[in-house]
Amino acid sequence: MRSLCCAPLLLLLLLPPLLLTPRAGDAAVITGACDKDSQCGGGMCCAVSIWVKSIRICTPMGKLGDSCHPLTRKNNFGNGRQERRKRKRSKRKKEVPFFGRRMHHTCPCLPGLACLRTSFNRFICLAQK
């Protein structure tokens, strides 16, 4: 008998979510999906999505004042091998298009800007000196 008096309450709790759920077949469409920088337009790069890590999307390059991510986090302790690697890396282009797979959700800064540290763990696109 008790279960019969709870039935209307249960129906009131379950009915609104059923009415608000989308019909079968509705899905999100992700525009701007990419695999490489060359698939994105000018001023954009192919970066990891902030919401779904397995998807890469065309993302605008950093403008003045935008937060950014440094190209490397490795410490340089000054031994010869690391110095040679650093010189070799500095010769490589660090611009868009990048032919590898980006591992972060931000793009490099626009040309003429650099990703500079402003506090312990914060980097911002600022004018190069």
Swiss-Prot record:
Q: Which GO terms describe its molecular function?
A: G protein-coupled receptor binding
Chief place where the protein resides: secreted
Distribution of this protein across tissues and organs: Expressed in the testis and, at low levels, in the small intestine.
Location comes to: Secreted
Which keywords, in A-to-Z order, does the entry hold?
A: Biological rhythms, Disease variant, Disulfide bond, Hypogonadotropic hypogonadism, Kallmann syndrome, Neuropeptide, Secreted, Signal
**Gene that this sequence comes from:** PROK2
The molecule here is called: Prokineticin-2
- Which cysteine pairs are joined by S-S bonds? 34-46, 40-58, 45-107, 68-115, 109-125
